[in-house]
Amino acid sequence: MAFRINHTHLKSPDPRKTAEWYVQAFGFTILGDETRVFGDRFIRCPSEDGGMDVNISGARTGETLGPGDASAHHGLEHFGFDSEHLETDIARLETLGARLLEGPIQSPTGSRIAFLKAPDDVRVELIEWRKSPWRAAAAEAGYRIVLNHDQ
């Protein structure tokens, strides 16, 4: 059996507020909002394209959470979203409270990236893919071509 990424899980002092930010910022949908037997509020949000669930929860009963860290660091460092226009998306996310950390950065292959600090000190990457006729044709046909992270 091939392994498939099932979800990403974010911890937040206010899970509903954080989930609503991702709804506005990236078109997530809130599918579940419950208090689990662990005592934490648990919200399930699939991404706009349905490719991955992002679970957002608070601390469990008796659990103390350390601070978030939006800086570059070891371990799970960020998650990325495709962008059709980097500057437009950066400006839109900043109006929602995100803060630009790095970029836009031009890669030698033509793609551009930027990193932002999202709620709860989560590091988010925006990726504006290189414009090319073959990539446009593939996208129109429903395919996404990625060459070595293409940045």
Which residues are covered by each model-predicted region?
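A short, acidic/glycine-rich surface segment
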Residues: 39-41, 61-67, 102, 134-136
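Vicinal oxygen chelate
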Residues: 90-151
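Short, charged/polar, Gly/Pro-enriched secondary-structure boundary elements
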Residues: 50-54, 64, 121-124
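N-terminal beta-strand motif that seeds the catalytic metal site of vicinal oxygen chelate
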Residues: 1-19, 76-81, 130-151
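Core segments of cupin and vicinal oxygen chelate
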Residues: 2, 9-54
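Exposed loop/turn and edge beta-strand positions of beta-sandwich/beta-sheet ligand-binding modules
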Residues: 4, 39, 75, 110
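Short amphipathic alpha-helices within nucleic acid-binding modules
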Residues: 21, 87-92
